[in-house]
């Protein structure tokens, strides 16, 4: 594989991993490294009503069979390796995904996942890059991590009113995510980071948007088309 294709491959894996990590959930979270354990996270430090809202959103996300995820960045996000945006349709059971990304200002670079294989379309040809398990980095694509790990340790929750996103009325909540969770999106993270979530107010408790401030830049993931049929073939 030439250097250009290898760079695109790595970038696609990271951004796809961010999408899957946000909404795919499993039964457990990986054990944090010793240096990350520090002071145990105490969710009781936050407003119980806001914690309940977060938990309901987690439960709703765990039940998804398909979703569309739009990834947008601001500033400098080194972990995405040149990708500044992506739009991905993801289906569970069996896992499949298809999308396009903007890589180093080149728009519309297609990629897909089928049968545990990931492919990227470069120079008008689809190239099979192998299985996700062989190509992905440790925790990014692990379905056992998922949204539960990303948001379950959030502290310092504060209500920030309401906001309409793509026609959906949402509750806006800010909080702090521990470094062990931030590493799902930024493997080099060493400290907790502020995050914001927007949760649908229509009774579905869908996670409409999540934004994580990584310091030099931020990653925003917006979900839509929950449980709608998606074309990932």
From Swiss-Prot:
Lipid group attachment sites (S-diacylglycerol cysteine): 27
Disruption phenotype: No growth phenotype when grown in culture, no release of phthiocerol dimycocerosates (PDIM) to the culture filtrate. Attenuated virulence, about 80-fold less recovery of bacteria from lungs of 3 week infected BALB/c mice.
Any Gene Ontology CC annotation: plasma membrane
Topology term for the membrane: Lipid-anchor
GO molecular function: lipid transporter activity
Biological role stated in the UniProt entry: Might be involved in translocating phthiocerol dimycocerosates (PDIM) from the cell membrane to the outer membrane; PDIM forms part of the cell wall.
SUPFAM superfamilies xrefs: Prokaryotic lipoproteins and lipoprotein localization factors
Extent of the signal sequence: 1-26
Principal location class: other
Protein name as it appears in the record: Putative phthiocerol dimycocerosate transporter LppX
Organism this protein belongs to: Mycobacterium tuberculosis (strain ATCC 25618 / H37Rv)
This protein's domain notes: Forms a U-shaped beta-half-barrel with a large hydrophobic cavity (2835 Angstroms(3)) which is large enough to hold a single phthiocerol dimycocerosate (PDIM) molecule.
The family this protein is said to belong to: Belongs to the LppX/LprAFG lipoprotein family.
Keyword vocabulary terms for this entry: Cell membrane, Cell wall, Glycoprotein, Lipid transport, Lipoprotein, Membrane, Palmitate, Secreted, Signal, Transport, Virulence
Biological processes annotated in GO: DIM/DIP cell wall layer assembly
InterPro entries membership: LolA/LolB/LppX, LppX/LprAFG
Location(s), subcellular: Cell surface; Secreted, Cell wall; Secreted; Cell membrane
Modified how: Modified by Lgt on Cys-27 with an S-linked diacylglycerol with a mixture of C16 and C19 fatty acids (palmitic and tuberculostearic acid), signal peptide is removed by LspA, modified by Lnt with an amide-linked mixture of C16 and C19 fatty acids, expressed in M.bovis and M.smegmatis. Hexose glycosylated in N-terminus between residues 27 and 55; there may be 2 sugar moieties in this region, expressed in M.bovis.
């Amino acid at each position: 594989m030439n250097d250009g294709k290898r760079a695109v491959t790595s970038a696609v894996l990271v951004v796809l991993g961010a999408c899957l990590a946000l909404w795919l959930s499993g039964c457990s979270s990986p054990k944090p490294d010793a240096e990350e354990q520090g002071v145990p996270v105490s969710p009781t430090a936050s407003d119980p009503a806001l914690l309940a809202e977060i938990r309901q959103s987690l439960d709703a996300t765990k039940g998804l069979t398909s979703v569309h995820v739009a990834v947008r960045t601001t500033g400098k996000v080194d972990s995405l390796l040149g990708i500044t945006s992506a739009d991905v349709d993801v289906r569970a059971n069996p896992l499949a995904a298809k999308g396009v990304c903007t890589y180093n200002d080149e728009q519309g670079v297609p990629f897909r996942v089928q049968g545990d294989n990931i492919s990227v379309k470069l120079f008008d040809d689809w190239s099979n890059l192998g299985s996700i398990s062989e190509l992905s980095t440790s925790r990014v694509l692990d379905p056992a991590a998922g949204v539960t790990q990303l948001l379950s340790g959030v502290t310092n929750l504060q209500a920030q009113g309401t906001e309409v996103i793509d026609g959906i009325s949402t509750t806006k909540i800010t909080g702090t995510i521990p470094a062990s969770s931030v590493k799902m999106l930024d493997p080099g993270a060493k400290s907790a980071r502020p995050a914001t979530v927007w949760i649908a107010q229509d009774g579905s408790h869908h996670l409409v948007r999540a934004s994580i401030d990584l310091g030099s830049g931020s990653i925003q993931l917006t979900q839509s088309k929950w449980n709608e049929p998606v074309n990932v073939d």
